[in-house]
C-alpha cells in the first residue's frame, strides 16, 4: 500500500514538470510537462483472481486529524482550490472509488471480446495506416496515438498486436465491421448495440461491490435513445 501511494505521488510530481520518475522497478521520463496533473488514482489488482492488492488516491489526507476534532486551518486545507471545478484536486474524494471517468483504451477489451464472441478470428488483420476518416475524405479524422506522436502507424496488425500496441484503428474496424484502410472487412459487425451489450456484461453499468465497505460511484454505459434526446 505504501509503495502504491508513494508511486502515485512521485509520478504526478514528475509529470507536472516533465521530469523523470525513478523507482526500484524502473524509471519513467515524461517528454513534456502536464502542469494540471494534480490528482490521480491507482488500483493494483491480482490478475488471476481479481483481488484488490492496494488502492491509492491523490491528494489524500490523514484521517487521524478528525479523531479529536480537526482545526479550522486543517479543514480548509482539505478543500478544493476551486469548489466550482469538479476536476479540481480534492483530498476528501477517493478517486479510486468515487471518481467516474471515461475508460480510455481499456475499453478495447470490451470491443475485442464482443467481436470474438460473435465469431471474429483473432488472426483477422488490417494494414494499419495510422489515421482514417470514417465518413469520407472531408470528415473528421480518427488516428492512432502513434500517428499523433510521430505520424507513424502499426502496420500489419491482428487482434493480438492491436491489444499489445493499443491500435485504435483496429478496434474501429472490428467495432464497425468495415475496414477503412482498404482491405478485407471483418467477418462480423458488432455495432453500437453489441458493444453496449458487452460493456454491461463487463459490469461497467454496475457497482463493484466495494460500496459495502467504501463509498463508491458507478459508471454509466451509454444509451442510444438517451443520446439522441440530448443531441
Cite the ranges covered by each PLM segment.
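Beta-lactam-recognizing serine transpeptidase/beta-lactamase-like catalytic domain environment
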Residues: 34-35, 40-105, 110-231
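Conserved, well-ordered alpha-helix/loop/beta-strand core segments that scaffold catalytic motifs
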Residues: 1-38
Amino acid at each position: 500500500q505504501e509503495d502504491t501511494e508513494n508511486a502515485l505521488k512521485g509520478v504526478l510530481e514528475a509529470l507536472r514538470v516533465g521530469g523523470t520518475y525513478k523507482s526500484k522497478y524502473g524509471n519513467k521520463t515524461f517528454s513534456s510537462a502536464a502542469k494540471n496533473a494534480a490528482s490521480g488514482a491507482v488500483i493494483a489488482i491480482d490478475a488471476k483472481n481479481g483481488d484488490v492488492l492496494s488502492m491509492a488516491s491523490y491528494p489524500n489526507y490523514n484521517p487521524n486529524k478528525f479523531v479529536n476534532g480537526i482545526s479550522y486551518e486543517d479543514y480548509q486545507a482539505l478543500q478544493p482550490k476551486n469548489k466550482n471545478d469538479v476536476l479540481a484536486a480534492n483530498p476528501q474524494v477517493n478517486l479510486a472509488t468515487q471518481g467516474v471517468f471515461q475508460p480510455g483504451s481499456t475499453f478495447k477489451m470490451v470491443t475485442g471480446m464482443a467481436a470474438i464472441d460473435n465469431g471474429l478470428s483473432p488472426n483477422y488483420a488490417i494494414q494499419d495506416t495510422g489515421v482514417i476518416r470514417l465518413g469520407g475524405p472531408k470528415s473528421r479524422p480518427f488516428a492512432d496515438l502513434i500517428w499523433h506522436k510521430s505520424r507513424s502507424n502499426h502496420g500489419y496488425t491482428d487482434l493480438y498486436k492491436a491489444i499489445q500496441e493499443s491500435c485504435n484503428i483496429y478496434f474501429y474496424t472490428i467495432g464497425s465491421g468495415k475496414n477503412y484502410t482498404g482491405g478485407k472487412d471483418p467477418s462480423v459487425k458488432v455495432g453500437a448495440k453489441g458493444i453496449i451489450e458487452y460493456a454491461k456484461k463487463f459490469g461497467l453499468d454496475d457497482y463493484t461491490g466495494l460500496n459495502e465497505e467504501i463509498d463508491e460511484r458507478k459508471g454509466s454505459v451509454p444509451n442510444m435513445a438517451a443520446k439522441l434526446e440530448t443531441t
